[in-house]
Amino acid sequence: HPLESWAEKHVGGSMRTTLKQRHSIIDRQLTDLIQQRPDVQILEIASGLSPRSWNFRQKFPNIHYRELDLPEMAKIKTRALQQLDAQAPEVLTADIFTQDFEKIFLGFDTSRPLAIISEGLINYFDKSMLNKLLQGITEYGQDFTELHYLTDIYPEPVKNKLANFIWTSSKLLKVMSRSSFTFHFINPSEIQTFFYNAGFSLVDVIQPTAFFQNNADSNLISFQNPEEHGGDLVWVIHAAVKKQRS
């Protein structure tokens, strides 16, 4: 689309590039995790019609991968998956802000790692709701040998050429979607502190420009300070809690 191309040239990013970046980084992080811990179990929250679960089951046939969504979407997704594979598991449903969420964790083996994924979700929650979600994940996941949470977040666009335009667009999105879409954090350290306070012990904030630069040339030294906002529209977070092995 001409507007997308203009944004990529003049703003340094667009919705198209942003979606591709976050999806690619989350997939890369999850693939690395599976290769490091082949026994990892996966729970993806609010995945909608994303084909990620299907793709990963094709790539890793023995993976225990479940999805959680709103009741109506869960029915639609279950039907779609089972048309492709009659053995595809049913998409689960629960309120992630109540103890109903805890029941979902009981369906996984605590002697194995658990990875939780969400994409395009947490900017729709205000800070108190986000904190409640994170505390629920760390509380209900405390008995697992390892607990990982992979998600994306839109930081305040303070270093973007069209920061005011993006802010206005986000307010419009908030009204149109009747949600709390907002920007919560300016720099990676604010995110790390917020996640630490919710019970995570390891928090890595991945900025796409540095990530793809470093992956393109492993001998290249990145000049971006990982503690500063590098200007990307979206970041990926890999938060974890790992038990000390005896």
Name each model feature, range by range.
Residues H1-I45, S50-S246:
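Alpha-helical subdomain
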